[in-house]
């Protein structure tokens, strides 16, 4: 794009290189210095060990990596200054007068797409290749404290495209002309915080799975191509990054006290102003859950404002795949409607800031199934028509023709089933999918209906009949007779996607007309999926279709190929969307980087944290794996237990890559629980759920009951002494010195919590005592010392010692100096540094009690969350 003010280049006043600058020579890393070039005497004073925000002189906005992404190819743009890691840059000298701009969040550098020398070539985030297009000369602006950045490759400067003031305007290279949109101020980042004793900036990423959870909604913006959002039942909301071809999480900022907001009941993207996004957030309607909230964004989910609601929402309850319940009036986009589960219909006329119940709407409770309103949909702009579906067996569809002032039940509607989705096509037809239960489980019947909104005629257009329902529904905005639907709970032979190009008169199955590529997430296989309640057709591309499943997303760019007898191609479209919930994780020394145990997916082994695993832990597959442990002195020996497979426990002798099920089990009727393995692998102690601990000395072939411990006592192995195990039970610390056969009490009056043993140090124990803080024992649990610096602790883990120290680095999930978060200590708990930030809080991850450092890489830490996957952090 050409710069509209480039009619005549405005030259800068140049100064000759000063003698002082000539004498300085090449600046040294880690000190403050003056930058200089052959054409500029002294530009800005820069601390090479610091990070800076680069503020546009023209707009006042800062240089920003889109969506906190860590992916190569992510666009660089200007954005409102939020002082977040993706807006912070280190200026790294190349040693010859040029600099790389290193992003704090990703560790990657700013470069020009394709190494281009062309005008208007886009700036993007790239892996450092020491390329000339990634290197910049920094020059001063006469009479100002601003600087310019000139590309070594092209000789052009960093420029905000079109002299724009807009949020999200792209950064490009353009010939220098002296414009304010090419000038930048360097604002040094001050690392501070009440809980910090030093700089703790980290880059956070997911150990990728690509999906792993239930995607309940997919919503395209109707005005802007490529703008797409996803909602999940317990992992928050996401925005699609077209350039990086992956999802960007939008709700990781939700903290522990607001964890209930990570279940997204519904979302709406503004058809008039694409920057506006609304989330109806709330996970449960139980008494113990907090009320829901509307999260309002004017920058596509980068930041939110919150309106608390006087009722609860149920983003992880029955019927969560229905919708959308939150919609925007296409004629008056400041007006929104929200259908609730137990409180009727609500309206806002000020972009979601305030809400009032629509008193005229007849249903103000949960209706037949307790799930209330299933969907709300507006008619064409200016029509004043609204349709509302309700989960009621007798009256399930209402219509208003006066903007919601009055309502009538639609005559002739089907009964006995409840609507899942309702979509109006461009020709005035209303399509609806029905099931005999809210779903996503428990559905045994269903149908698809078409309603002629002008004539009032109903027609059953179900593509098939059987012991299953219908849920997902999409109509092509460009072709109103093209309709797609999905089955729900058709467990045999499998669920199905149907497609019609004649308004439902005839249908084609898609599973037998498609080729499926699961290479992004091989563990999912190429089956069509289940719980396919979210289905959407791109309003700008009829071939681009996506649908959600209980495990993620499938996508196609040629779904319309089957219309003419061809074959469509589908691929996993869930990269970046991580919705798994974890029970345990370990990082054995010198072996696999990470082995996990989690719900629904069982577990994975990672040799490369940047790549999705090739498959689940198998032989046996334990779909809900609750515990994993390894032998400290023989880390190739790994054990895991859980439920949901043919066996409940297994052993690996090669670091988690291959497995064999235990030949025996303590209590055949029980499962799950926790397992510990001796430091040398000579014995296992397994406590199944509701049972006493049992011990095996023959690698799981036989088991004998442990003496001295009660039911559900969790056992921990000493990480040095092979004969020693510990258990914290009802405030008493027990120990065994005979390989777990017999336990005796050593200390009492202890708080409940999670007990952990330090690798390689006999008798060194840490107790995360919940609200009582953190306790430490160096004598095998005979005595404990409470750390005054820690107010509460959910879990503590250990990793490689910091350079120059010998004791393991400590990682804490807890509260220090009034601040809750993730902390690191390199001095045995005397001082703590917070290493997560307010943008990375992941809801109630503390409740999972999963934190471990990496034994081979100092500073790396792994955090298991409840719905946002396995997070790992590295110092930036």
Predicted regions, residues:
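Extracellular glycan-interacting surfaces
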Residues: 2-43, 189-876
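Lectin-like carbohydrate-binding module/patch detector with strong preference for beta-trefoil
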Residues: 22-32, 44-191
